[in-house]
Amino acid sequence: MDEQVVKLAKETVARYRELTEELSDPAIFNDQRRYAEVAREHSRMRRGAELSERFLEALREEREARELIPAAESAEEREFFAGEAREAGRRAGELAEEIRSELIDRDPNDDKDVILEIRAGTGGDEAALFAGDLYEMYARYADRLGFRHRVLDASPAEVGGYKEIIVEIEGDGAYSVFKHEGGTHRVQRVPKTESQGRIHTSTATVAVLPEAEEVEVEINPNDLEIDVYRSSGPGGQSVNTTDSAVRITHKPTGLVVTCQNEKSQLQNKEQALRILRSRLLEREMRERQEREGQMRLAQFGSGDRSAKIRTYNFPQGRITDHRVGLTVHNLEAVLGGELEEFTKALAAKERADRLAASATGSPG
């Protein structure tokens, strides 16, 4: 049996018991931040701990059955104990694979909600229209999965679509579903204004951020520079007579977040802080992955925005994902939210990459 899995199972059970004991101590309610941290970790570890306990029990049963074989008084008895050992070993092997999938191969951010930042790239008006198409595609896919979604901020383009739109998607495992959408999406189609029928190529970029909770990313108010101004619509015209739009600059990193989608300044500030926390969490993830030598997995998993990941060819009605070499010829259905074929293929590639990294001893 894989000693790595045995060691991990024992550590998982021990840690889960520690967390259970801590949650049962009334004193923890005096520190709400600590309570939230422990409760979140306890919930996240529950399935892994249950699998680990069943795995260790199966190993114990296999060992005990094998120990009884030499003392058996008949061939039938020896075969019975051998059969018991084989059955327990088979269960242990199956559980080991589940543990590997749950605890080794799994991204710790998979259970989180997600923030998608969609921006028009090269291609002018067509890029803005394509950014709008991507937003509609993700919104419809979220609806199909029963996830909630809402626009946190948007900069509409005059011709339609968006120069930028930031969307929050809430649901169990939302990040695991959308995390592979990060990167540059390319569209090839004939613009409505093109009289010669020439195909134009445009791009839009998507950044995928696991939504950070307050307990994960602490922000010092002294590190923030907050400006307020009037909201504006397409073309820059004012759509609000009060200074409700908010721009927050995080001075230590230089990150800037603007939000003008809500009607009140307070709501826009809260939304901007949520986006800022998620960007800071993503930044921390990337820095950690770089330190651990995981840039290949990092770019695949969290979305290297410079990488062209997918091409949408309207004249041929096809979509190609360049990371897994998958081409489908139902472009309209995919833009209508039927993304499952891509998300399943990308999740399978991630699992294979993580397993390969684990087998070679690389961090993963």
From Swiss-Prot:
Q: Which SMART domains match?
A: PCRF (SM00937)
- Assigned GO CC terms: cytoplasm
Q: Which residues carry this modification: N5-methylglutamine?
A: Q237
Q: Which UniProt keywords are present, listed alphabetically? A: Cytoplasm, Methylation, Protein biosynthesis
GO MF terms here are: translation release factor activity, codon specific
User: In the UniProt record, does the keyword RNA-binding occur?
Assistant: no
InterPro entries attached to this UniProt entry: PCRF, Pep_chain_release_fac_I, Pep_chain_release_fac_I_sf, Prokaryotic/Mito_RF, RF-1
Q: Would I find Cytoplasm among this entry's keywords?
A: yes
Q: Which residues form a coiled coil?
A: none
Task: Tell me what PTMs the record reports for this protein.
Answer: Methylated by PrmC. Methylation increases the termination efficiency of RF1.
Q: Where in the cell is it found?
A: Cytoplasm
Family, per entry? Belongs to the prokaryotic/mitochondrial release factor family.
What the protein does comes down to: Peptide chain release factor 1 directs the termination of translation in response to the peptide chain termination codons UAG and UAA.
Instruction: Write down the HAMAP family for this protein, in alphabetical order.
Output: Rel_fac_1
Cross-referenced PANTHER family, in alphabetical order?
LD18447P (PTHR43804:SF7)
Q: What is this protein called?
A: Peptide chain release factor 1
Q: Which organism is it from?
A: Rubrobacter xylanophilus (strain DSM 9941 / JCM 11954 / NBRC 16129 / PRD-1)
Top-level taxonomy: Bacteria, Bacillati, Actinomycetota, Rubrobacteria, Rubrobacterales
